[in-house]
UniProtKB/Swiss-Prot annotation:
Biased composition (Acidic residues): 306-321
Stretches the record annotates as Disordered: 284-321
Source taxon at top rank: Eukaryota
Record PTM: Phosphorylated.
Alphabetical keyword list: Phosphoprotein, Ribonucleoprotein, Ribosomal protein
Upregulating conditions: By blue light.
Listed name of the protein: Large ribosomal subunit protein uL10
GO molecular function: large ribosomal subunit rRNA binding; structural constituent of ribosome
Family classification: Belongs to the universal ribosomal protein uL10 family.
Subunit field text: P0 forms a pentameric complex by interaction with dimers of P1 and P2.
Matches recorded under InterPro entries: Ribosomal_protein_uL10, Ribosomal_uL10, Ribosomal_uL10-like_insert, Ribosomal_uL10-like_insert_sf, Ribosomal_uL10-like_sf, uL10_eukaryotes
Length: 321
């Protein structure tokens, strides 16, 4: 006959298992387990078998084990896990892709009836339509101020009604009506509340971000930095091409301002081309990977210029009367 371990021995074994998992796994999903049954939890364990382990336990025992293990190993990052604990918490240690593990967990959520006294996790709306109940059941609807009518010997709900709001407790009348209608409005399972990844802690919403989302946010950040740099005249790499272009344009305009009114139309056209080439060259220098690209762009620009006037019409002769 096997000897049953004592409570102290169970606590020691649990502590050793938790410490071993903390050393072996660098990724932990912290999940709430409200209203999750043992059969449902067993199904989740089977579904995650291979690269993930689900560990449940009392909060006080888990916090104590993590705190002592962090002190013994000198890994203070583990204290971040301790601060994320909620009532009825579960730890999911994994070596797989965090997003895939979370999706696998969500598959095991099951529908549940609205029992009296439960706090509603979502808004419960009763849809319009025929209920299939006989007219003697109208008292349930009248108590809850649900508009109904009798249609072909059955009770029909006229308009949709918000029966229970999120965060409210389910009353006896609401629970009885939903049971008669066969509505199971709630679903329960492990809900990932926080993510621990090698010392970093973040919200599970981060797992929903795609590469396109990251690129869009990066582009927005660069645009904001560029605008701010230009506004306060502070040099940054992002604003360098724009600053160079604006600087070259302003410099030429300042030089030409005293004689601008006396220039001939042909010389004004030459000035416009010079400003355009300067702007294009500065922009190319800021975006091209090497200097050769800017030079090639300048040469190509030169080739495309129509030879309308001689060399005497451009250059320093612009400042002559």
């Amino acid at each position: 006959m096997a000897v049953k371990p004592t409570k102290a021995e169970k606590k020691i074994a649990y502590d050793q298992k938790l410490c071993q998992l903390l050393d072996e796994y660098s990724q932990v999903l912290i999940a709430s387990a409200d209203n999750v049954g043992s059969n449902q939890l067993q199904a989740i364990r089977i579904g995650l078998r291979g690269d993930s382990i689900v560990l449940m336990g009392k909060n006080t025992m888990m916090k104590r084990s993590i705190r002592l293990h962090a002190e013994n190993t000198g890994n203070e990052n583990l204290r971040n896990v301790e601060q994320l604990f909620l009532p009825n918490v579960g730890l999911i240690f994994t070596k797989g892709d965090l997003n895939q593990v979370r999706e696998e967990i969500s598959k095991y959520k099951v529908g549940a009836p609205a029992r009296f006294g439960l706090v509603a996790p979502i808004d419960v709306v009763v849809p319009p339509g025929n209920t299939g109940l006989d007219p003697s059941q109208t008292s349930f609807f009248q108590v809850l101020n649900i508009p109904t009518k009798i249609n072909k010997g059955t009770v029909e709900i006229i308009t949709a009604v918000e029966l229970i709001k999120k965060g409210e407790k389910v009353g006896s009348s609401e629970a009885a009506l939903l049971a008669k209608l066969g509505i199971r409005p709630f679903s329960y399972g492990l809900n990932v509340e926080s993510v621990y990844d090698d010392g970093s802690v973040f919200s599970p919403e981060v797992l929903d971000l795609t590469e396109d989302d990251l690129l869009a946010r990066f582009a927005t950040g660069v645009s904001m930095v560029t605008s701010l740099s230009l506004a306060i005249s502070y040099p940054t790499l992002a604003a360098a091409p724009h600053s160079s272009s604006m600087g070259a344009t302003m410099f030429l305009l300042l030089l030409l301002q005293p004689t601008m009114t006396s220039l001939r139309p042909r010389k004004l056209r030459s000035i416009s081309r010079i400003l355009a080439v300067a702007s294009c060259s500065c922009s190319s220098a800021g975006t091209a990977p090497t200097g050769g690209g800017a030079a090639a762009a300048a040469v190509e620009e030169k080739k495309e210029e129509p030879e309308e006037e001689s060399d005497d019409d451009i250059g320093f002769s612009l400042f002559d009367d």
